[in-house]
A protein has these predicted regions:
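A short helix-loop-beta-strand connector motif used in the catalytic cores of GNAT acetyltransferases and
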Residues: 45-56, 81
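Conserved GNAT acetyl-CoA-binding A-motif
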Residues: 108-120
């Protein structure tokens, strides 16, 4: 990599630069209003995490989008998941999301992942159309989430309580 797609290039972030940190700091709020601010330390943790690839897309040299690909092994095999896909609002409709997602699929296939999953809000019409055009099919499933209320650096009391059971 980098992989070119028209005037869009996609690359895996191997080291955090000031440019990458600044661009992702602008992109993340466009993805989630509730996302906490991105620090260099957190971004370096993401980049260094085993099984996690942070992809960025450039157009005209500037970072205009990002995607995170996570691969993990479970008893049924190697799986992949696409998360945190966002293209800068000023650059949408130029094939950046397609280039990012296609590159992530290629990486997952090279690693022999059995499946690649992602979620997308039904209101994101263009994104859902893109994913279907790339071969994703909707699954009949319900996504559940529990949101932690404790700080990231606090001990996991639920597990600690289970360990202390008679």
């Amino acid at each position: 990599l980098p992989e070119e797609s028209g005037s869009v290039s996609v690359e895996i972030v191997r080291q955090v630069s000031d440019e990458t940190l600044a661009a992702l700091t602008v992109l993340l709020p466009q993805l989630s209003a509730s996302a906490s601010s991105l620090t260099r330390e957190r971004l370096e943790t993401v980049v260094a995490a085993p099984g996690t690839e942070l992809l960025i897309a450039r157009t005209e040299g500037a970072i205009a989008g990002m995607l995170t690909l996570v691969t993990y092994t479970i008893p049924t095999g190697l799986r992949a998941r696409i998360e945190d896909v966002v293209v800068d609002h000023s650059a949408r409709g130029r094939g950046i999301g397609k280039a990012l997602t296609a590159t992530a699929i290629d990486i997952a296939e090279q690693r022999r992942a059995r499946t690649v999953d992602l979620t997308s809000a039904p209101t994101k019409t263009a994104a859902n159309q893109l994913y279907q055009n790339l071969g994703f099919t909707p699954r009949e499933t319900t996504t559940y989430r529990i949101t932690s209320t404790r700080p990231a650096d606090s001990p996991n009391t639920r597990l600690a309580q289970q360990d202390e059971s008679p």
